[in-house]
């Protein structure tokens, strides 16, 4: 040890001192992109899914919602999106809460069109929001919701709403969002109370992708229903401005 001290100088440490040093901090490697994310990247789709946890993507021209976990699809549903006159906005937001048995009041443009009377619709199966609605962001009045016109999901072209997204498999989506089973979803939806359940802030992407992977190696191409082309720069704001940007009272 004396020889080591001479060679290394007074700053050297003994074996005992070295043993007492705290272990080096573990450096964690970034999560590997999921196979689906790799397909998105290969196609040049401008969408970055969380590598861990849940996310919801609505591809407007595909009329489809996909619920992802750890970057992989877990639930797919047909949806009805905004019409070209009242387009669904292209935005990134998050789940805020789930409202069971919502009330509803139409937007001013709906009233002006004569499509709906200016009144508050009570909860129930005749309500245009259906039996439940997923609220997005704080103060963001675009919902993912059930509908009283479920036969419209049979149409191939489903750009029919005033901006909100009607979800065919709404009950399964709500069960997935809240981590509850379908029996509990239906019990709340068919009950007598109107109430909110706070939800985790799951990221929600309302996107406009004309090419999108299907998860089996195939790539689907979709019609440009809003005539936005492939570049969504200034068109993004224009799309939002053209939409009602609200489902009105819920």
Where are these regions (language model features)?
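N-terminal pre-domains immediately preceding structured catalytic cores
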Residues: 11-250
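Bacterial N-terminal signal peptides
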Residues: 1-9
């Amino acid at each position: 040890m004396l020889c080591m001290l001479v060679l290394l100088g007074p700053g050297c440490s003994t074996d005992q001192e070295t043993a007492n040093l705290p272990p080096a901090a573990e450096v964690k490697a970034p999560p590997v992109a999921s196979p689906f994310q790799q397909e998105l990247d290969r196609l040049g789709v401008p969408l970055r899914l969380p590598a861990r946890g849940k996310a919801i993507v609505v591809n407007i021209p595909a009329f489809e919602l996909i619920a992802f976990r750890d970057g992989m699809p877990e639930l797919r549903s047909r949806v009805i999106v905004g019409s070209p006159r009242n387009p669904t906005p292209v935005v990134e937001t998050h789940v805020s809460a789930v409202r069971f048995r919502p009330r509803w009041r139409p937007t001013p443009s709906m009233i002006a069109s004569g499509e709906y009377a200016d009144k508050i619709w009570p909860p129930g199966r005749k309500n245009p929001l259906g039996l439940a609605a997923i609220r997005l962001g704080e103060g963001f009045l675009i919902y993912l919701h059930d509908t009283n016109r479920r036969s419209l999901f049979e149409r191939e072209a489903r750009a029919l709403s005033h901006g909100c997204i009607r979800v065919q498999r709404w009950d399964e989506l709500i069960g997935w969002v809240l981590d509850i089973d379908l029996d509990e979803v239906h019990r709340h939806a068919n009950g007598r109370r109107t109430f909110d359940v706070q939800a985790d802030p799951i990221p929600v992407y309302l996107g406009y992708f004309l090419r999108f992977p299907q998860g089996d190696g195939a790539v689907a191409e979709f019609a440009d229903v809003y005539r936005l082309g492939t570049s969504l720069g200034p068109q993004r704001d224009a799309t939002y401005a053209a939409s009602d940007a609200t489902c009105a009272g819920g």
